[in-house]
Amino acid sequence: MSLKYARVLLKFSGEALMGQGQFGLDSNTLRQVVLEVKALRDLGVEVGLVVGGGNIFRGAQIEGAGIQRTTGDHMGMMATVINALALRDVIEDMGMSSVVYSAMAIEGVSHGFNANHVKKGMAEGQVAIFAAGTGSPFFTTDTAAALRGIEIDADIVLKATKVDGIYTADPAKDSSAQRLAELTYDDVIQKNLQVMDMTAFVLCRDHKMPIRVFDMFKKDAVIRIVKGEDEGTLVH
């Protein structure tokens, strides 16, 4: 089977793992996400994951409490580690091999990030999960996804969202909104489209890393993407 993308970096939010809940992890949603990963692995696609931590902690929760921004960001990074560990175990429960690489040193819990080591493991079939963002405050997990995607020589960054691409307007508010099949990086920046943060977009643009925005819960969407079919919105 011919695949357009052999190595992908999949980014999704921590909130996506809550299911219908308001906090934490939903077991059915976790397994649903990992089934998409398994579908990719069954095709032979090498997979790296970046997950947010908003289902466990968000900085806005502590604004005004006297906690510094840098401390809040570090707390958010730790939340992504919790999600990464959960994903690793579910991935392995489904018969795959997986390793958590954290940008923050957590001895006995995760591995430190080394691009060459990661790429070797992925080539051998391991699903690489990148936790703790970039390891530095003031950077989002979107930026971490862009950075890790570039570092591991991914063919594309797949940005999973609640909608099936980028639209001309908010489809939840405007019934005439149309999905845009393709955009350039500069289109997104000039129009200030709020799907991925600008730092991440500029990083991808400067390193010619394509981004595909898609609905992570649309059945087989990620499979269609790696086969080169029209799905979501391509930014390149």
From Swiss-Prot:
Organism of this sequence: Hydrogenovibrio crunogenus (strain DSM 25203 / XCL-2)
Positions that bind UMP: G53, D73, T134, G135, S136, P137, F138, F139, T140, T141
- Report the principal subcellular site: cytoplasm
UniProt lists the gene as pyrH
Q: Name one GO molecular function term.
A: ATP binding
Q: What is its EC number?
A: 2.7.4.22
Q: Which Gene3D superfamilies does this entry report, sorted A to Z?
A: Acetylglutamate kinase-like
- Annotated pathway: Pyrimidine metabolism; CTP biosynthesis via de novo pathway; UDP from UMP (UMPK route): step 1/1
This one is known as Uridylate kinase
**What taxonomic classification does the UniProt entry list for its organism?**
Bacteria, Pseudomonadati, Pseudomonadota, Gammaproteobacteria, Thiotrichales
